[in-house]
Structure formats: structure tokens, C-alpha cells
Amino acid sequence: MVLFIRQLSGHQGKDTLGRRACGGNAEYPLMDTLTYEISSTAARLVVDEGLEYGPAKRRALKSLGLPARTPLPDNEAVEEAVREHIALFCADTQPGELAALRRLALVWMERLEGFRPHLGGAVWQGTATRLSDIHIQLFCDDPKSAEIALINQQVDYEVRAVNGFNGETVDALSLHARCPELGESVGVHLLVYDHDDLRGALKPDRRGRKPRGDLGAVRALLAEA
């Protein structure tokens, strides 16, 4: 087994990345270097290849020659590593790509305004690049109404079952939309929830951030850019 361990000089004391990935409240004198390597490798795969966090973490284990049962860092640790990777390698291109994806997301949210669309994922959180897909949650009175709307708009889409934000299985209506600013097609995934699910959808995460935003919130992000 080959491990790639970085020399972490000057990292004595508390370290939130290693502490959070282990899931406890203990304070470690040194960064968990193994967790850091997994997070950093996964972040590179997320940014450079467009992988989702789960597949990126599993592939990171293989890349580092680690056993499949090696504890994985949580998504917050990977997100922090993604932000570091973007700051180091994509700082000149990522902001424009993010804005283009948010504008495309806004177009689809406006097209489906009647279904209470909320933008989530990397495009909402600000870590998206041109390889990222757009994830929009719809909160419908009738779960089939969103499909009917797409059919009426003559939109080609595929239906697949995915895990929702509460761990339940929900339908995802997946399609490809042309992004003129990027000059290519982007994956757009419309996750269909019941209207009642909207109550818990806006609960802040552990950092106090909103996990998704409605039309007004997305417009505000674009106005700030």
C-alpha cells in the first residue's frame, strides 16, 4: 500500500479539517494527514473531472492505494479541499464559469417557477466549474406535474431514482441544456419533492449556511457578482 503523505510544517495545534472528518469533538495536535490526502485527491477529481463527492472519495482511495474500508472524509472536508484547489489552480476561470452556470440555472428556475424551484449543490454553494452539473429541487403539489410541464415544453429528459436530502428516494428529471456562455451543454437535474418537504429544505447546515436558495436568492447572488 502506497501512501502519499505531505510534510505539514506549521500545522500544529487545532485543525478543523482533520477534526471534522473524524466526526468527533476531540482536538488533534496535528492534522490527520491521511484524511487530508483523501480530501485533496477527491477535490482534484471533483474540480478537474466533474465527479460528485461520493464517487470522487471512493476513487481517491484507489488512487492512493488505500483499502476500500478506509474511513472517508465527510463532504464538508472535501468541500473545503475543493475551495482550496479552486483558489490555487482555477482562480482566474472559475468565477466566470460559476456565474454562467448560475445564469443558466436561473433560466430553468424561471421556466419552472410554478414548482417552487430551489437551487442546490455546487452551483449554489459557489464551488462549481464548467464541468459541474446544475441541481434544482422542485417542490410540487403533484409529483407528476413537473414531468407534464417538461413534456408540454417539448423538453427531452430521463427519469432516475436518487437519494433525496432526507435520505428518501426521489425522482430526478435529468436533461441537457445548452449554455451559450460556456459554449457547451450542461447537465441539469430536477429533483422532484412533495410540497410539504419544503419545510425542512431550508434548515441551515452545521456552518449556518442555507443548503439551497429560491429564485430571489439566486438573483441576489448574480447581482452581487
Task: Report each predicted region and the residues it spans.
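Catalytic core of pol beta-like nucleotidyltransferases
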Residues: 32-50, 57-130, 141-225
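Short hydrophobic transmembrane-like helices used for membrane targeting/insertion
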Residues: 1-5
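Short, solvent-exposed linear motifs at loop/edge-of-secondary-structure regions
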Residues: 17-18, 140
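Short hydrophobic/aromatic beta-strand micro-patches
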Residues: 135-141
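Cationic, low-complexity basic patches in intrinsically disordered or flexible, solvent-exposed regions
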Residues: 8
